Amino acid sequence: MLADTPGQKDRVFLILTGVWLFTALFLFGNPVILDYLHPPKSVILGGESPSNVLRYLGILAVLGLACVLGFSRLSKPKLRLPAGVPKWLAWLPAAWLGWQLLSFLQTENQAMSQATVIHFASCLVAFYLGLFVLGRMRLAKLALWGAMLGLMLNLADARIEKFGGLEQTRNNIIEQIESGKLDPATLAPKAHDAGNTIPTKIEKQIAALPPGTAAKVRQLPIELVKRMYSSRLYGRMFYPNALAGLILLLLPVSLALLIGQGRWKIPRAAIALGLAAVGLACLYWSGSKAGWLIAIALLGAWFLHLPVPKKLKLGLACAAMMLGLAGFAVKYADYFDRGATSVGARFGYWRAAVQTAMEKPLLGTGPGTFQLAYKRHRAPGAEPTRLTHNDYLQQASDSGWPGFMLYAAFIGGAAWVLARRRLDDPVLIAVRLGLLAWALQGFVEFGLYIPALAWPAWLMLGWLLASPINWFDKSVAPE
């Protein structure tokens, strides 16, 4: 039989969990409420893309099967909290989901909120799977190899984009326009481009096309034109900043898994070196400014874990961060000279979220409905958006201040508990660094709403909380 012994059954569960993670990174890089907005290389121009409902139900079924198999392997009591995990922290996510359900009852858009609540529920399932199941399994790290393979696939796709893939995509769209297969006029009504113009740099490239083709390209939605002519990489993710978030979340643990104890040390070290080089290059090519800054913070935090004298660790960390900031200043000097438009746009989103939370402080407008609230507060000429680009403030807008406080208390509480632990296992240290990056990026992005980012983050968070404790200050360690 496939799994006759307890050890074999554990392996089946871990492999199934790894398959779930790999599939999430392969197929579910879009926000749950933006499933019809794809990168140009995969969009069917002229119409909305086919629904992902069946695939989504399939991946949820795999997650459900993993839960049944995983919890069946546990001895009673099955919901016994691991040592060192406060009860209030363990059950805060359940309270947060409960509040989302209350908000759902009065939502302004049932379809958006239903998709969001189902996604949030799947995140909680992943968290408790890590907390109660992975935390008790000796071979738990095996499941993370699926996430590592998914990261490698995204990086391979991004590398192809860098070396001709993006240009080929652009040329294919232009060929469709010239052949008549694509009529830009059918897309223009969807663009919502009032007050927006094509950037000067892109306009120069369009002007180099034949006059008739150039005129038709200008009729395309401006957002699509920007994507066509962008040099930023996104792999299989929704957009470049999401790829940066994926790299920051999973590259540290992937390297730790490869370099860790085991056979074939030299080949694994060589693969790790190549993965690090490609990962950092793709992070740079993604053009994510927040990603660069978070990477600097992670590098400084990693230096603090080195087994060297404290003064040397601090010196290395400070030097690395100063060099990184200097590089950032040089790289993006022109961006800030032009007014840092994306930063200004985000402040507009955040202002609208706070205004909505003030208007509906108890239950908000409903999970995942910021797009509707933003339309009421959007300044003339401001960029449209469907998400707040801040996971924390979106809770306030969508589910009121109680939803915000529950989510912020959970993420902040988990950070506080994990910061007090001294970790010796390189894989656990890498997981903590990746989760730190995910939590920080949540202040400027929407990783909570992207399954490929949220699922591995919640799973690893539960597993890390359940990991063996080694407290900095044992006098205050919980009983």
Residue ranges and their predicted role:
Residues 2-3, 473-479:
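Short, charged juxtamembrane terminal tails flanking transmembrane helices
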Residues 2-31, 55-73, 86-105, 110, ...:
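Alpha-helical transmembrane segments of multi-pass inner-membrane proteins
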Residues 33-51, 221-236, 344, 348, ...:
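Juxtamembrane membrane-water interface segments that cap and precede transmembrane helices
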Residues 38-57, 82-86, 113:
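Interfacial loop-to-helix junctions that mark the boundaries of transmembrane helices
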Residues 71-81:
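Cytoplasmic membrane-interface regions of multi-pass membrane proteins
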Residues 104-105, 360, 377, 381:
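A short secondary-structure junction motif
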Residues 176-178, 215-219, 341-360:
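Extracytoplasmic loop-helix module adjacent to an early transmembrane segment
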Residues 201-210, 348-353, 363-379, 391-395:
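Glycine- and aromatic-enriched periplasmic loops at the membrane-periplasm interface
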